[in-house]
Amino acid sequence: MRSEVVNMLEYLYPLRTYLIVSGVEKPNVMTADWVVPLSFSPQLLGVAIGHSRYTHSLIKECGEFVVAVPTIELLKDVWKAGTLSGAKENKMEKLSLTLVESKKVKVPSIKECQANLECRVVKEVETGDHTLFVGEILHVTHGDAFKDGKPDINYKFVMHASFGKNFTTNSSERFEP
């Protein structure tokens, strides 16, 4: 077995890819692979966002965010949300996603996603060049991919295969936007 120092985070992939919605006046959507469950009671999750990201400033400003769960049918929008900058242009004009009113937070949810987890920030942890935003899940809406609150693995959830343009799903297929 080789031992060398490289980008060690590559060894954690593939990871599920989510859409993070932030902002109220001018909502923004970004992709994030670094989303993690943190607690059952209270229900908490964490999302690590780089300090330089526009989404970082929006979450700091409003204290809320939505974690949306896309399937592979949304891959082109997932790719655009992760490669365009909301600070430089209105991403929503480039995406074919529909923002809908959330139930418990001011930040909108995404109609086309199979689940939307509405979160209020309860803690921020500085972790080098990222902030781990700890969000209490206040409400969840879901589609058919989560009947009875459990994921249906017949739905192809987006997974980032590695840094870059390779994606996969919970199947063995590989996809590119």
Curated annotation (Swiss-Prot):
<dbReference type="InterPro" id="IPR052174">
    <property type="entry name" value="Flavoredoxin"/>
</dbReference>
<dbReference type="GO" id="GO:0010181">
    <property type="term" value="F:FMN binding"/>
</dbReference>
<keyword id="KW-0285">Flavoprotein</keyword>
<keyword id="KW-0288">FMN</keyword>
<dbReference type="Pfam" id="PF01613">
    <property type="entry name" value="Flavin_Reduct"/>
</dbReference>
<dbReference type="InterPro" id="IPR002563">
    <property type="entry name" value="Flavin_Rdtase-like_dom"/>
</dbReference>
<dbReference type="InterPro" id="IPR012349">
    <property type="entry name" value="Split_barrel_FMN-bd"/>
</dbReference>
<comment type="similarity">
    <text>Belongs to the flavoredoxin family.</text>
</comment>
<protein>
    <recommendedName>
        <fullName>Uncharacterized protein AF_1786</fullName>
    </recommendedName>
</protein>
